[in-house]
Amino acid sequence: MVKQKINYKSSLAYYDIAIFVKDYISENTVIVCIGTDKCIGDCLGPLVGTFLKESSFPLPVYGTIESPIHALNIDNRINEIKKIHPNASIIGIDACLGDTKSIGEIHTRDYPIHPGKGVGKSLPDVGTISIIGIIDSSDSYDFFTSRSIRLYLVMEMSKVITHGLTHAYDLFLD
């Protein structure tokens, strides 16, 4: 298993994401962004999905602020996506909890996301590969009510991931 840790503030963060993702991206790739806008800490995925859609990203993107994929609908939405794209390679994107020193890191991994794991939920794995953004500490008393997560952090990390995916697609075309 390969995992790369990238600080979102690095000027080359988008490039590091792109270099990793380019080896997995193809015309048969689908982007699945997990989370909800009902919680600042959980909106990283839907923000990435929204930014990709707004930029006319050429690959299918699921999970946006308007139409999120979250704990209550993930089973149905993933089944729908797999029916529409039966042979697709999926890149899963989600927010994650981690150590305090890891907040602000973006991890690119050659294995799926385990959504809900950090908050004790058992949901289906998503993705052939995954990109997670660590937005808060797992030491926080309650992820869903934590007031320490800044929307600015989530927005900036979402922009970096979006830029990385866009650049990865450009590298794939070259």
Locate predicted features.
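N-terminal catalytic or cofactor-binding beta/alpha core of small enzyme domains
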Residues: 1-174
